[in-house]
Amino acid sequence: MSKIAFIFPGQGAQYVGMGKDFYDAYEEAREVYRKAKEATGLDIEALCFTENDKLNITEYTQIAMLTTEVALLKVLESKGVHADVCAGLSLGEYGALAAAGVMELENLFQLIRLRGIYMQEAYPVGGAMTAVLGLDAGVIESTLKGIDGIVSIANYNCPGQIVITGEAQAVEMAATALQEAGAKRCIPL
């Protein structure tokens, strides 16, 4: 007997046009975008489907990601595809909560809108985050000590993936230094 798992991504997986094919093809997806717009007052379609500077600002990224995740989820469910288990990374945990039916969508959208706003306030424009792949935490920690400006580890996602954050210029310098120290990749978030 096979089991189905839904895994929801965290912030950093966003891109302009995400979910557009589903939005165009399925009423279930369009309904989710409408509900998110009603709950938050934001033009989620414009945020997700048109070139703009907002999509990569935490305040907007989070609601855009969650709306897209839930839209895809509702399309799959309308086709009879349901998860036996679900999980999510960071922001993706809320997509998993939606899949589990733990919260009403309106409340979930409002919660994530506020989460994005509060995180943005704690992490103002001028800051940056980067995922560092394939480098030992000890090497990252020691490398960051040599960087001018404010930069530190924000999250130990899993072995081999650590997120750094701080002043944009310091994070950029750290990413360069970490790649020189052996990181497989540094991905701005």
Task: Mark where each language-model region is.
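A short small-residue
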Residues: 48-55, 95-96, 187-189
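Gly/Ala-rich beta-loop-alpha elbow adjacent to hydrolase catalytic centers
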Residues: 69, 84, 88-92, 96, ...
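Alpha-helix C-terminal capping segments
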Residues: 74-79, 97-103
